[in-house]
Amino acid sequence: MDIINRYNRNEFFSADSIHFDTSLKYTTPGGRTVYGGGGIMPDIFIPMDTTGYTAYYNKVWNTNVLYRFTLDFTDRHREEVDAIKSLEQLDEFFAKHDLIKEFTAYAERNGVATNRHQLAVSRNTILAQLRAYIGRNTPMGDAGFYYNIYAVDEVLKRAVVEIKSRKK
């Protein structure tokens, strides 16, 4: 229930909504302020981005239709998928397929009617996830996943920026 309460208090969307018990305040030997009581406040707060979330997206996600499609798609194209050894080959493979068209047909066959307006709003999120989960099923594994999910994952994008800035 804590996660639902945090969501309802907007803690996923604004750092200003997160309140700490100051009686549990502690300063580390390195001079950082931390608070007891459980949980960790990250040094960098990235608000949750729900702009691509619609009722249609929630339905295909919560019924596992999106993930099941990627497994079915991978199985139907197993020989091609197993031959993918680079990100360039993965992009070439995806260029040959209209994933959104195939996915919406699959979703409809599995009881999720397509809402064209909501699909337009959620399209980039859905497409990135389709590509990511299919990419994970290639011999590249997680590299195929993260290469594709990066397009819509603001936390991952910021992490890359922070890591690169610390290497300088």
Enumerate the predicted regions with their spans.
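Conserved functional hotspot residues or short segments at active or partner-binding sites
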Residues: 1-168
